[in-house]
Amino acid sequence: MLSFHQLKFNIYQKQLFDNLSITFLDSAITYIKGANGCGKTSLLRMIAGIMQPSNGNIFYKNLNINNIAKPYCTYIGHNLGLKLEMTVFENLKFWSEIYNSVETLDAAIHYFKLYDLLDEKCYTLSSGLQKVVALARLIACQSDLWLLDEVETNLSKENRDLLNNLIVMKANSGGIVLLSSHTENHIKSAQILQLT
């Protein structure tokens, strides 16, 4: 379970949200929607512990996220978290070791069909393939909370379908997935959190 209690966030003297209280139960898929600048990315970054709210608390599994050892979630944002000078395999191995989940590395490579790219330096890949390598972390790094910030950008239809299937599988296994998106909701069973 993930919950916000009276969350408030101001940036550059602009209030993005005030007194935001909501609970996401296990197995939830939620699209965070809203206009540019309404706080979608900021909210995901706060849940990930990268930013702090101006006021209020965020709880995951009934613990304040400030008191949980990191990493407790997998966050993929605009900065994909790739070491561009490293190979695809080195990047995935690096992240799986941080999450103590090396045993899932092969599954990540197989699911996103990365075999032919394993020895490629990430800087040689297109932005779409770099995004796929970052998304492979969802399998390589075992966590029950996924925070995905506009991850469908630059993805082929095939990889978008793989991602959506993976999100549904994560929710079906009890995980929580929050994703911001400017595109149509591809997962019809997902709920919508509209920020204004």
From Swiss-Prot:
ATP binds at residues 34-41. It comes from Rickettsia bellii (strain RML369-C). The lineage of its organism: Bacteria, Pseudomonadati, Pseudomonadota, Alphaproteobacteria, Rickettsiales. GO terms for cellular component: plasma membrane. GO terms for biological process: cytochrome complex assembly. The keyword ATP-binding applies. It is found in: Cell inner membrane. Keywords: ATP-binding, Cell inner membrane, Cell membrane, Cytochrome c-type biogenesis, Membrane, Nucleotide-binding, Translocase, Transport. Part of the ABC transporter complex CcmAB involved in the biogenesis of c-type cytochromes; once thought to export heme, this seems not to be the case, but its exact role is uncertain. Responsible for energy coupling to the transport system. InterPro entries: AAA+_ATPase (IPR003593), ABC_transporter-like_ATP-bd (IPR003439), ABC_transptr_haem_export_CcmA (IPR005895), P-loop_NTPase (IPR027417). This is Cytochrome c biogenesis ATP-binding export protein CcmA. The keyword Membrane applies. Pfam families: ABC_tran. Its main location: membrane. Belongs to the ABC transporter superfamily. CcmA exporter (TC 3.A.1.107) family.
